[in-house]
Each structure stands twice: as structure tokens, then as C-alpha cells.
């Protein structure tokens, strides 16, 4: 007879889970009892925050929930930052944790790893937090924590299993999976949206992360409407090198002008949040004349004044609109998009343009790569203006929750989800030091990741912000390690280059020939502050 812990692993496998990230501990041993026989791959990070970020990167690339196994108390607290990032970016993630015995909960007796209320803490970032208290709970609790991955706006969920429950015999009936329904689109609302768009003279599409898997249909709709497509950070790549594409932040004045001049705006799968639409913290959002908004989350639809809110999946809505709209609508979309691109690129200034050129050099050296970023200067520049050549292949932690240390472990998760695709991680020397130990995980798993370290000797973005605010610069110059020595200690091939044109591409191409994980240090000049 199996234990409840073993049964949980088996039921995760039945739900399509094929990889978990975790560091075993005495409070999760029962989960590991069934893991070897399950066929699920286990990846051991060097810190539980890394487990969460790996699960995030895995989920973004695979489209399946990333799963982390963590111990009671510190294991879960270490994972909360990654859960916060996943919550901000609507990434499906399940964190399974231990917890002390049922009879001890809430009594504060000082047990190992004890917290006053672990689920209450998890709920600050998790969409759902549940506890399995008996064998009969297991299947319905799994249904509940998986529901958001299938039926609404995804995010992190949490399931805890007390020590005594995990080891108890599993005697429940064979589980049946309950699949939550995706909200059905309203045919009447689709018809209304099609009519508004058909009458438009200057339509525009705002594309968010909800369209990542619908690139072909989105391009068809944009071409039919003659509508420029402004892409948020999580939608980059869906309109690569397309005349209607505007791969620039809607926080830029040039893009805001384009939006304001559009008589109908169709927002697809975007939360219209300030980390995309007000990056400069002006306290204002782009001016919109008439807004049609499609979102899978009813709560999101209530947050902005919308002429026509449509509850449903963005990809399904695109298909429905393509079917409902006959003929071409506007003829000037490509000209409007081209002007916005030119003006936006001019607006970001010479320093940011140079960083964008470096990103284009990386893209040209390794076409079709998945590019994962930490909060680093090239990533900030790319979030302002960068066109990637792979849908869903540009993502980072510089927006939303904005957690440093994301890039290295998230790239590992991405590489595990797409083992035949090159993965490039871009991290600053400051952010990289949050998660350098995870390099050994990439080495151990033999993953084809090139880690680019943008070394400007400190937190240059913060130092600049301090100067702009009239504050003396303090605490922004942590001494970076010798990255050549770091690479050698991890057994990683190492290259060093500077920012002169061609240098990064040459190092990247050499790294691709070498195969496996590698480290490239880009010696950037610190900005004068």
C-alpha cells in the first residue's frame, strides 16, 4: 500500500507533470519515496528560491505548470519571492511543501521549521493555498490547486502536506480529475467588437502575455484590420519584423501618441499594469478613446474603464474576431507603426539604443534562442524597445514583481522545458550574485545555456536613480567576483569581451560551438554618476 506522499507524486504524473524542482529535507521524504518510480525528473537547485524561479522558467516555455517541492518553514519562505514573481506575471506554478504534524499546528511549541500559520503566509502570494489532511482530501485538493492553470488567469498555488499525513496509508478511491472550464466567449460581444473594429479608421491592438501562443492568428487579425500591434514585454516575438509590429513600451511618449490617435483599441490578454504602461511612474496611463478589452480574468476587466469588456481566452477571441470580420478595415496601419517605431527608438536616447544594438547582436548570433533576463541594463533597454525572433522567447524579471536573481535559475527551467533550443541568460553582475550557485545546477544537468554577465561593477541603474533624485550614492558598488575564476570552479567554458560591435557575437558563436553551459563576461563601462 502506498503512502499519501507517494500517491500525490503519482497523481502529479497523471496530470502531466514530468519535472519537479526541489531540495529534499526530512519534512519531504515521503514525497521522494515515490519519485524515482514515477518517471518525473527531479532537478536539485542550490537554494529554494532557485527552485521557484526554475519552475517559473519551465512553465513559461513549456506552457505547463512548474512544480517545486520544498520543506516546511524556511523552504517555503525561500520560495515566496519566486511565487511573487509568478503571481505578477501570471505564470502557472505549484509549490508543494511539508508542514508539521496536524496535531501540532497552531500550538507554537517550537517544532523544527515551525511557523505560526504557514498557509496564511503562502496566501500573500499564492492564488490558492490548501492542506491535505486525509487520503480523501488528496484528489479534490489537487483539482483545486490545478484549476487556475486551466480556467482563468494562472499564477502560483500552494499545497501543504503535514508530516503525519504524508506518511499515512493511501486508501482513497482512484482519483478522477475535474477539469475547470475556460470562460466561454459571448457571441454577442464578439459581434459587437467586430462591428466596432470594422467601423474604425485607425484601429490598434495592445498585445499582452495572453497572446504568446497565438502569433499566427494575431498577425492575421492585425493584417485584416490594418492595425499596429503594440507588444508588452511578455508578448515580444509575436510580431517579429512585421510591418505592423511595434515592439516598444507603451510607457514611451511615441507609443502613447500612437495609442491616443487610435479611434478603437483592442487590448488582448494584457493587465494594463503600470510596469508596462507607466514604467516612468508618471502616475498616468496612455489615453485611449474607445477600448475593447479581452481578458480571462473577470477581476482584471473591472479595473479599467472599458467600453466593451469581453471575458474569455485571448487566443480564442482572436480566432472569433478573425471569423467575424470580413475584408480589410484600414490601409494606413503600417505607416503608423513605422512612425511609432522610429520615434520610440529616437526617444530612448543613445545609451539605451546602444544596449538595444547589443541585444540585436545577440539575436543575430544565435537566432531563435530563448532569451531570459534578470534586472540588468540591457534588459531594461530591451523592455523599452526590442523585437525578438521567437514568440515567448523574451522574458525577464525587470517588470512586474522585479526580483533580482531571477535570470540564472529561470534560464535553467527554460532549458529543461526546451532541451533542443539554445537559451541565453542576461544578468548584471549585481543580480547574478543573488543566484550564482545555480550555475552548478546547469553544469550538473548539462544544459545548453550561455550565461551572459553584464559587468558594470555594481547596481548602476540604482546609482543613476539616486543621482537623479539628489541622493548621495550609497551601497551601489558591491565588488563583483572574478567571473573567470567562478567559471573555472564550476567547470564552465569562459569568454570575456567588451561592448564593441561584434565582440559579443564572436564570444557567443564560440560558446555555441563548445556546446553545453558556458559563461561570458561582458565588461561594460560603469555609467558616470
Label for each model-derived stretch:
Residues 5-8, 13, 23-36, 337-418:
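Active-site diphosphate/adenylate-binding microenvironment
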Residues 124-131, 176, 336-349, 490-492:
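Short glycine/proline- and acidic residue-enriched helix-loop micro-motifs
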Residues 1-325, 361, 441, 448-451:
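N-terminal alpha/beta PP-like core and its mobile active-site loop of ThDP/TPP-dependent enzymes
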Residues 47, 107, 111-112, 180-192, ...:
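A general structural motif
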Residues 104, 108-113, 259, 301-302, ...:
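Thiamine diphosphate
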Residues 136, 172, 287-375, 496-529:
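Phosphate/pyrophosphate-binding active-site segments
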Residues 268, 294, 373, 428-429, ...:
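Active-site flanking residues adjacent to catalytic metal/cofactor-binding acidic residues
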Amino acid at each position: 500500500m502506498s503512502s499519501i506522499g507517494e500517491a500525490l507524486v503519482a497523481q502529479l504524473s497523471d496530470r502531466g507533470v514530468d519535472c519537479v524542482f526541489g531540495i529534499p529535507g526530512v519534512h519531504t521524504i515521503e514525497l521522494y519515496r515515490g519519485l524515482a518510480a514515477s518517471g518525473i525528473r527531479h532537478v536539485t537547485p542550490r537554494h529554494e528560491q532557485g527552485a521557484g524561479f526554475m519552475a517559473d522558467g519551465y512553465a513559461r516555455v513549456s506552457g505547463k505548470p512548474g512544480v517545486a517541492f520544498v520543506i516546511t518553514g524556511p523552504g517555503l519562505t525561500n520560495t515566496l519571492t519566486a511565487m511573487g514573481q509568478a503571481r505578477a506575471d501570471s505564470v502557472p506554478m505549484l509549490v508543494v511543501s511539508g508542514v508539521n504534524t496536524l496535531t501540532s499546528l497552531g500550538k507554537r511549541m517550537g517544532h523544527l521549521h515551525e511557523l505560526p500559520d504557514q498557509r496564511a503566509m503562502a496566501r500573500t502570494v499564492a492564488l490558492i493555498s490548501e492542506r491535505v489532511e486525509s487520503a480523501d482530501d488528496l484528489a479534490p485538493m489537487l483539482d483545486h490547486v490545478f484549476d487556475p492553470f486551466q480556467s482563468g488567469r494562472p499564477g502560483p498555488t500552494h499545497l501543504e502536506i503535514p508530516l503525519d499525513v504524508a506518511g499515512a496509508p493511501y486508501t482513497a478511491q482512484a482519483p478522477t480529475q475535474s477539469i475547470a472550464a475556460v470562460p466561454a466567449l459571448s457571441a454577442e460581444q464578439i459581434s459587437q467588437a467586430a462591428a466596432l473594429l470594422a467601423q474604425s479608421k485607425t484601429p490598434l491592438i495592445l498585445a499582452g502575455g495572453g497572446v504568446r501562443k497565438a502569433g499566427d492568428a494575431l498577425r492575421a487579425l492585425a493584417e485584416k484590420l490594418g492595425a499596429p500591434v503594440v507588444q508588452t514585454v511578455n508578448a515580444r516575438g509575436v510580431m517579429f519584423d512585421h510591418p505592423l509590429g511595434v515592439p516598444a513600451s507603451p510607457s514611451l511618449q511615441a507609443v502613447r501618441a500612437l495609442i491616443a490617435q487610435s479611434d478603437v483599441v483592442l487590448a488582448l490578454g494584457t493587465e494594463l499594469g503600470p510596469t508596462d504602461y507607466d514604467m516612468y511612474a508618471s502616475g498616468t496611463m496612455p489615453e485611449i478613446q474607445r477600448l475593447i478589452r479581452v481578458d480571462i480574468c473577470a477581476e482584471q476587466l473591472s479595473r479599467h474603464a472599458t467600453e466593451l469588456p469581453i471575458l474569455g481566452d485571448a487566443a480564442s477571441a482572436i480566432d472569433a474576431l478573425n471569423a467575424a470580420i470580413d475584408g480589410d478595415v484600414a490601409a494606413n496601419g503600417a505607416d503608423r507603426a513605422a512612425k511609432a517605431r522610429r520615434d520610440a527608438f529616437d526617444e530612448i536616447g543613445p545609451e539605451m539604443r546602444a544596449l538595444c544594438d547589443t541585444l540585436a547582436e545577440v539575436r543575430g548570433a544565435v537566432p531563435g534562442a530563448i532569451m531570459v533576463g534578470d534586472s540588468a541594463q540591457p534588459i531594461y533597454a530591451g523592455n523599452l524597445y526590442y523585437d525578438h525572433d521567437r514568440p515567448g522567447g523574451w522574458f525577464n524579471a525587470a517588470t512586474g514583481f522585479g526580483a533580482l536573481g531571477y535570470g540564472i535559475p529561470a534560464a535553467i527551467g527554460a532549458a529543461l522545458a526546451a532541451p533542443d533550443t539554445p537559451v541565453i541568460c542576461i544578468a548584471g553582475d549585481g543580480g547574478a550574485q543573488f543566484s550564482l550557485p545555480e550555475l552548478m545546477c546547469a553544469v550538473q544537468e548539462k544544459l545548453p545555456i550561455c550565461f551572459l554577465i553584464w559587468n558594470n561593477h555594481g547596481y548602476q541603474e540604482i546609482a543613476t536613480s539616486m543621482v537623479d533624485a539628489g541622493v548621495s550614492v550609497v551601497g551601489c558598488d558591491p565588488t563583483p567576483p572574478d567571473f573567470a575564476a567562478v567559471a573555472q570552479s564550476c567547470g564552465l567554458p569562459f569568454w570575456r569581451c567588451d561592448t564593441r560591435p561584434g565582440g559579443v557575437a564572436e564570444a557567443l558563436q564560440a560558446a555555441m560551438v563548445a556546446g553545453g553551459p558556458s559563461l561570458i563576461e561582458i565588461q561594460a563601462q560603469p555609467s558616470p554618476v
